[in-house]
Structures are given as C-alpha cells and as structure tokens.
Amino acid sequence: MIRGILLLLLGTTRFSPIQCISNDVYFKMFSQQAPPEDPCYNKAHEPRACIPDFVNAAYDAPVVASSTCGSSGAQRYCEYQDHERSCHTCDMTDPLRSFPARSLTDLNNSNNVTCWRSEPVTGSGDNVTLTLSLGKKFELTYVILQLCPHAPRPDSMVIYKSTDHGLSWQPFQFFSSQCRRLFGRPARQSTGRHNEHEARCSDVTRPLVSRIAFSTLEGRPSSRDLDSSPVLQDWVTATDIRVVFHRLQRPDPQALLSLEAGGATDLASGKYSVPLANGPAGNNIEANLGGDVATSGSGLHYAISDFSVGGRCKCNGHASKCSTDASGQLNCECSHNTAGRDCERCKPFHFDRPWARATAKEANECKECNCNKHARQCRFNMEIFRLSQGVSGGVCQNCRHSTTGRNCHQCKEGFYRDATKPLTHRKVCKACDCHPIGSSGKICNSTSGQCPCKDGVTGLTCNRCARGYQQSRSHIAPCIKQPPRMINMLDTQNTAPEPDEPESSPGSGGDRNGAAGMAAQSQYYRTEGGRECGKCRVSTKRLNLNKFCKRDYAIMAKVIGRDTSSEAVSREVQRRAMDPDVADYEMDQVQPGSARSPITGVYEFQAADYPNPNPNPRGSEMERFDLQIQAVFKRSRPGESSGAGNVYGMPNTTLKRGPMTWIIPTKDLECRCPRIRVNRSYLILGRDSEAPPGYLGIGPHSIVIEWKEDWYRRMKRFQRRARTCA
C-alpha cells in the first residue's frame, strides 16, 4: 500500500519542483545579483545627501527610573475607573507582580500590555523621573508616552533633552493644566523665527486621551526647510531624553472615599475590590486634601506602558545607515570622506574644504588635500580658503622628500627643482651641493640650482674660477684677478694664423695689429723665472672648414698625466729626429721611473706666437704629456705629403684611439701658451711637421681648445665636407 502511494506521488507532475519552475526563473535564483545602489551616490557616482531610515530610537534602549513600584518590597498600588478603585500588590522579586522600567521600551503589543509603575506618591512635591539614553545623537520628530489602562494622568510634567549624553539638560516641552502658574509660560504661545528653538507649554487635561505626545517641529516656521536652519537642526538633536513628573491629576473624590469604607479583598491575587461610597464624607476627604494630588494611603502612582521616540540617526546627510560596532556603540557608516560617530568631521587628509552638512542642493563632500604625494597630514585654513574664492583651503603638514609649501610644491632651502621629474616624484628636489669655499651661501636658486658664487667664481655649484681669474689659497677670496698680461692670453678659441691669409685681413688669424685686438708679434714680457715670452696669439674668429683642411690631423684627447723629466724627453726627441723609425715603446723605456704631477688651471689657452719660425728647434727642452686619444676626426694617409717645411720628413700615420705622447717646448708651457690641465679633454688640430713621428707637438699652426660637446657635431660635419678641401 505504501509503495503504491509513493508511485502515485512520483507520477503526479505537480509535485515535481523542477517542472514547476521554468528554466529562466530557476537559473536566475543562482545568478550573481548586482550590488544595491549606495543612497549617498547617484548612478554617475556623484555624491548626494543621504539619511538613515526613520526608527523608534527608544526601542530596546535603557531607561532609568527614579522610582519603581515594589523595588523596596511589596507595595500596594491602586487603579481608578469611573467611580471605582481597584488596588493590587507589586513586588520586584515576583516576575508576575513586577513593573520594571525596561517595559517602557520593549515591543509594544496592545494584546499584551506591559507597564512601568512608580511607587505610590505621598504628596504633591514628589518628582519622579524617567531617563532614556539613545546611545548617540538622533534628530527627533516626536516623543510619545502611552499611559497604562486605568492609570491616573499626570497633571504637570516636563520633557528635557540632552545633547552631551546627560552632562547638561534643557527643556524640550512643558505639560500642565496651569502653565503660567507653574512654569511661567502661556498655554498657547505664538512661535516665530526668533523663538522657534524654545520650549512651549501645553495642556494635558484633555479627557479620553490615553497618551501624551510632543512633536518637535510642529508650529515652528523653519520646519519646512530644515536643511537651511542650523537653529532647528540643533533643536531636534538629542542623545538622551528625560521625563520629570511633577504631580498627578486629582482622581474622583468618591473613589478616594471608598478607601475608608472598606470592601472585599482577594489577598491571594493582591487585588482589592472597593465599592463606591456616597455621602458627605467624600466632600470632607476632598476638603482635607486641600487640592493635593494624593495622600499616603491613596495608592496613586505614575504608570506608563510605552515610551516612544521617533527620529533618525543623526549623520548630517553623509550616511544612509547606522550600525553597532564591536564595543556595542552605535555609529554612522559615513560616506563623502567624512568621519566621526555623527559624520561630523572630515576624515584625515581630507581638509581641502571646510566640513559642512549635506543638503538637497549640495552634498558638501570632503576633499583630499593636494600635497603632491609628499605629505600624509594637512589642516584647513579658512583665510586661504576665502582668498581662493572657496576652491581650496588645505595646508599640507610635515612635507617629505625635501619639499615645502602649502601643497609641498616647492623645494626647501638647500634644494632645487629637478625639471626632468614630475612634481609628484619622490626625488624631484635635488641638493644644491654648493661648494663650501667657492659659494657665498648654501641656498641655491630653487629653479635653476645656481649657487651664489663669490667674486671671480663660476659654475653651477661655484666650483671653479671664472675667466680672467686664477685660484688662490684664500678661503675668503678663492679666485683672484689675473695680471693684465695674462688676461690678453685668454680666448674661447685657440686659433693660430694661416700662412696664406692676408695680414691685413680684419678679424682674421693673421691680423696682428687689427681691430680684433691682436697682440703685436714684437711685444714680449719676462716671467718670474726670467724667461722672455711673446704674447699668445689671440683670435676671435671661429674655427672653420678652412682651418680644418689646412691641418694634417684633428683629434679629441684627454690629458691623463705629465712627465717632468724634460732632459730625457729632449734627448729622445733628438734621437727620433735623427732616426724616425724608432718605435714608440722605446720612449717609455727611457723614462721607467717618471713621475706625474697634476697641472692646475682654469682657462683655455692658445699656442704661442713663436718669434722663431722653427717651432721645435732641435736641442730645445721639451715637456712630455700622456694623452688618451678619444676620437680621431682627421689624420694623414700613408704617402701623403706632410706639407712644406716638415723637418722630420714623413707624415704621422700612427694616430688612432688610445695612448699617445704629446711634447710641448718648456718655454711655451712657462709662457702658458697653451696652458694645459690634467684630466681635461682638448680638441687638438696641427701639422705632422711640428713633431717627430709617433708624437704630437705644438707649433705656430697648432690649435688647442678645451673640449666642449658642441665640437663633436662640428668635427663630424667637417669630416663629411673634407673632400672639398683644396
């Protein structure tokens, strides 16, 4: 039988879940759902004002009562209905007879009413308070107290609010049948914008009303535009609510009279059923009361079944939700780069504009400070914000990477901007590295990096002497002016006169007395050592293709050392003059222990204007320099004529990249024509006739210029055009 029932069920299609649900609906159940939209941003992810849901802020919140029936043992309380009074027993130790304050904020169910009851009042001066803590700031719309069934109504009470978690209190609303006598306020007070933030008083003696309600915005002029009214925003804000009951309404005197008449008693249930008594005695009791609310035996008390506070979690328009953290504290889930329990401030490093409440017109999102990635902290400056016409007010703090300024956009003192790097680069600022002796300070130009140089000093870091100055041993004046006879020897080019150029050509290399300021050949001077020197030839004419063509070689070489053993060099030069086939390596064997000393100097010098037409007379003293040829732009080919007047008889075909020996007459060095410095590169143009084979020499046709990068392209251009040389 059971088997038949199972077959019947399986054969019935309406019980098959797969067949009851269509394929589309079935697969949609497991498809990935799009995340819900954030109420604080629109579809374009632009910020907009958002608010949390409207809630009963009092639900399940803690309430502290100053008086609770039965807290000090079993007590009697009485209820009044029509002309009958019924009395009961309360006891906090008995759950069925206890009326704790937590009943005020539990789930309100009309079918199962729970109440808080105070201890029976003993006179009109008793004040009973209820204090409700909301946990954080809320923007409230109403406060409602629901009375327990058959409970006497309060005649006078005050609702207070606190915005600092109970540290201070201010009146929120007064209730009384005698507003002016008790609180000094009229029962019907007109409200304008000047007093819309003040508490008012209203009458609570309306019959057949089981609750007391207070609306925070009712009758206040700015309530329709709360966003633009900071006064009302503060008015509706509260962290705690306190209700103070001052006195009860007087019950029916006939019901109070029954207290003396006695009646049936149900001790088991704690309920007293007292019949109504009529007679003149009732009037006597009322007269004895003298207007007081209660007597010690009346059993009158305050009884509230529900304490409701409607409002929204205060997030200032920057959050759509409040949640409880691990410590149980209620906080806003802030958006718009805001922070705080109420989103009342901008989060760190977002102070480029002042914090403001979000409105329907403007979200007032907090903006990140612009520190170009060089700072992690900033602050807001209102004066700067005003000067920028409301664009930016953030001031960066503790700028890193040697930067400074409001936006860390400048290099601090002692550093300058590296233009090759973006402003956000961590190495955008380079140290000035000003020379401690050559500079007059450690602070360079923040843009160019130029250090302030002392007189006669030049260079980006003030590390060399300027033209016309020579180095001294003084730290105060490291570069001093050279004598006039030495200044005339300076020029940016080392240009010798061409033999075939007219001597009267103005500005040419052969013009010895022309407008170009050439020194006369016959003018001489003596050095401190007594040597007679002719002035170095100076020319303002640029190096050109004609001069390139008239030289046998053109090289770029670096001076790497100097040999001071001039006598051995002179003997070797004489021997090579007599036997040009001697190998180069023998020169090194002649000087196995030669010493090299650095040559100091600052300027570019030219070859001397030799009075003797024989540039290197045999037997004259020579100085030897070690060169490292770095580039060869021109050299003589085998069999090519080395020009007229070649005293050595053959072209120099050994020029190539690598080491080479450069010989210069001692006289020319002492006369500083040219002035050679170790570890400097030079452009050298000359003729093979000015030195024996295997050497480079200096003669009247030599050109020696300190190397500059611009020369490379010019030499290459001359190389290509050399075929046009005559």
UniProtKB/Swiss-Prot annotation:
SUPFAM superfamilies, A to Z: EGF/Laminin, TIMP-like
Tissue specificity annotation: At the midline of developing CNS at the time of commissure formation and in different subsets of neurons, muscles, and epidermal patches.
Sequence ranges assigned to domain NTR in this UniProt record: 533-725
Keyword terms of this UniProt record: Developmental protein, Differentiation, Disulfide bond, Extracellular matrix, Glycoprotein, Laminin EGF-like domain, Neurogenesis, Repeat, Secreted, Signal
GO biological process, one term: dendrite development
InterPro entries: Laminin/Netrin_ECM (IPR050440), Laminin_N (IPR008211), LE_dom (IPR002049), LMN_ATRN_NET-like_EGF (IPR056863), Netrin_domain (IPR001134), Netrin_module_non-TIMP (IPR018933), TIMP-like_OB-fold (IPR008993)
Gene Ontology CC terms, in alphabetical order: axonal growth cone; basement membrane; cytosol; extracellular matrix; extracellular region
Ranges of residues in domain Laminin N-terminal: 46-312
Laminin EGF-like domain sequence ranges: 313-368, 369-431, 432-481
Pfam families per the UniProt record, alphabetical: EGF_laminin (PF00053), EGF_LMN_ATRN (PF24973), Laminin_N (PF00055), NTR (PF01759)
Intrachain S-S bonds: C313-C322, C315-C332, C334-C343, C346-C366, C369-C378, C371-C396, C399-C408, C411-C429, C432-C444, C434-C451, C453-C462, C465-C479, C533-C671, C549-C725
Gene3D superfamilies: 2.40.50.120, Galactose-binding domain-like, Laminin
Subcellular location field: Secreted, Extracellular space, Extracellular matrix
Role: Netrins control guidance of CNS commissural axons at the midline and peripheral motor axons to their target muscles.
Protein name stated in the entry: Netrin-A
Species the sequence originates in: Drosophila melanogaster (Fruit fly)
Gene that this polypeptide is encoded by: NetA
